[in-house]
Structures are given as C-alpha cells and as structure tokens.
From Swiss-Prot:
This is Calcium homeostasis modulator protein 4. It comes from the Eukaryota. Residues 38-48, 130-183 are extracellular. May assemble to form gap junction channel-like structures involved in intercellular communication. Channel gating and ion conductance are likely regulated by membrane lipids rather than by membrane depolarization or extracellular calcium levels. One of its GO terms (molecular function) is monoatomic cation channel activity.
C-alpha cells in the first residue's frame, strides 16, 4: 500500500464522524438484507408478538454487546481499572480515573450507534412492529367484528400480516390497521432518533465540561493513545521474536532458518518437562516473572540476563 493511501486510511480511521457514518450505513444495509431474507411473520395468536419483538430487540442487544466487545480499549479499561484481581501495588490517581471515565463514555457512544440505528431503521420500516402488534389492534368500531368472539377476533387479526386474498371488507380493515401500525411504528422511530440526537448532544457537552483536558490536550491525548498502541504492538512483536530466537537457540543450539547449522543441542527429558508447564506474565510481587513456556528452563542458568538485557550477535 502506497504512503499516500496509508495516510488517507489512517486519517479516516481517526475521523470519528466517518467511522460512525460507516457503522450506521453497514447496520442499515445489514438490516435490510436480514429482514428480506429471514423475517416471516408466523401470523398465529400468541406468536406474532414474541416473534416481531425478538427481531426488533435481540439484534440490537447483540450489536450493543459486540460494540463493547470489539473495542480493545474496553478490555484495557476493564483490566486496568475495573478488575478486582488487579495487583494491589497499582495506584490510580484521580486524573487517571477521570481519563478512564472519558474513554469509557467515548467507547459507549461508539457502541450504541449500531443498535440505535437498527432500532430506528426497523421502526421506520414498520414490518416487525406490524407483526408484533397485529393481534392487539382495536377493531371495536368495525361492524364486521360485532358478532365475532374474542378468540376468533384475535385469530383474524393475527392473520392480517399474511392475508393475501380475502373479502373486500376484510381487506379494507386490514389495510387501515396496517397503516395505523405503520404510523405508530414510524412515530416511535422518529421519537427514538430525536431522543438519541438530543442525548448525544447533551453527552458531548457534559463530557467536554467535565473533562480535565482542554480541547488541544484532548486532541494530543487521543493521538498519544493511538501512537502508543501502534508502537507498542510493533516493538512487542519484534522484541518477543528476538527473545524467542535467543531462547530457542539455547534450547536447540540453532535458530530456525539458519543455512549453515554446524551444531545442534539435544534437549534432555528434564528440558521437555520444564518447558511443558507455562508460567504467567509478571504476576504477584515478582516483577521479573517469566514470559513463556521456554522461560523457566532456558534462563535459569543466567538470571542476570533479565536485568542487563541480551546481546544479539549476527
């Protein structure tokens, strides 16, 4: 990928409006595809409500959970600030708590975009609501239902979403009820959009007012977090690879990929036993804890390597 394209992709990734719009567009497309391919109202008493409500609410809940779960910052906050198993020596300053709350509100704002978009689109479409509310429609003012029992009335109403061929008077009632439900559903959709917009505006204002950072400081802090994550991942990958090459060479006597292997080491039975049980990463009071399966065995002959580092020879 050329540097110019890399810069464009990087700038788009940091543009919150673009990311939010992309999430909303993908949610709308997914909802339309999902609705056209999977939704089919059962048109039975007692099932319409649960079926329509499930298609309306459950995907929104799944999108909400996924919105939190797919954000790496969410797991960072959970592990560093919320986990009760965190090391006792880790002290958190008030400023750090405020910044963590600010990050959490930012994550929440991004996570609720997809479920709110799903709810708004489904309500504006009205298909799920029409199925769920069909058997609860009020038809007392229609003469054709005067001599119909309550159970029969519910059965007729439940079949309206699937009714294709029927007497003209029934079709007239069905169309009027469908328009009423469509009206109610779309009104709820617009109310949801209005409330979500107001809530987003108020939340942004409150976050800016309560933030310990100025506008420029927040911009710098956001860039700092992104660069910190990118550079750490790059350095960690290179560091772990070099460290593992060093330990593999100690265990087997050569490095994978070497063209002129003149000497190999045969691991003993004790070597295999020692590297079969993994150790945890720097847990407890031992800040110089081992990092991998190979850490127990191959470094025990030189404990000073951890403090002074490892010399990498060509």
């Amino acid at each position: 990928m050329c540097p110019t394209l890399n810069n464009i992709v990087s700038s788009l990734q940091r543009n919150g409006i673009f990311i939010n719009s992309l999430i909303a567009a993908l949610t709308i497309g997914g909802q339309q595809l999902f609705s056209s391919s999977t939704f089919s109202c059962p048109c039975q008493v007692g099932k319409n409500f649960y079926y329509g409500s499930a298609f309306l609410v459950i995907p929104a809940l799944i999108l909400l959970v996924a919105g939190f779960a797919l954000r790496s910052q969410m797991w960072t906050i959970t592990g560093e600030y919320c986990c009760s198993c965190a090391p006792p020596y880790r002290r958190i300053s008030p400023l750090e708590c405020k910044l963590a709350c600010l990050r959490f509100f930012s994550i929440t704002g991004r996570a609720v975009i997809a479920p709110l978009t799903w709810l708004a689109v489904t309500l504006l479409t009205g298909t799920y609501y029409e199925c769920a509310a069909s058997e609860f429609a009020s038809v007392d003012h229609y003469p054709m239902f005067d001599n119909v029992s309550a159970s029969k009335r519910e059965e007729i109403l439940a079949g309206f979403p699937c009714c294709r061929s029927a007497p003209s008077d029934v079709i007239l009632v069905r169309d009027e009820i469908a328009l009423l439900h469509r009206y109610q559903s779309q009104m709820l959709g617009w109310i949801l959009i209005t409330l979500a917009t107001i809530a987003a505006l108020v939340s942004c204002c409150v976050a800016k007012c309560c933030s310990p950072l100025t506008s420029l400081q927040h911009c710098y802090w956001t860039s700092h977090l992104q660069n910190e994550r990118e550079l750490f991942e790059q350095a960690a990958e290179q560091h772990s690879r070099l460290l593992m090459m060093h330990r593999i060479k100690k265990l087997f006597g050569f490095i994978p990929g070497s063209e002129d292997v003149k000497h190999i080491r045969i691991p003993s039975c004790q070597d295999w036993k020692d590297i079969s049980v993994p150790t945890l990463l720097c847990m407890g009071d031992d800040l110089q804890g081992h990092y991998s399966f190979l850490g127990n065995r191959v470094d025990e002959d030189n404990e000073e390597d951890r403090s002074r580092g490892i010399e990498l020879k060509p």
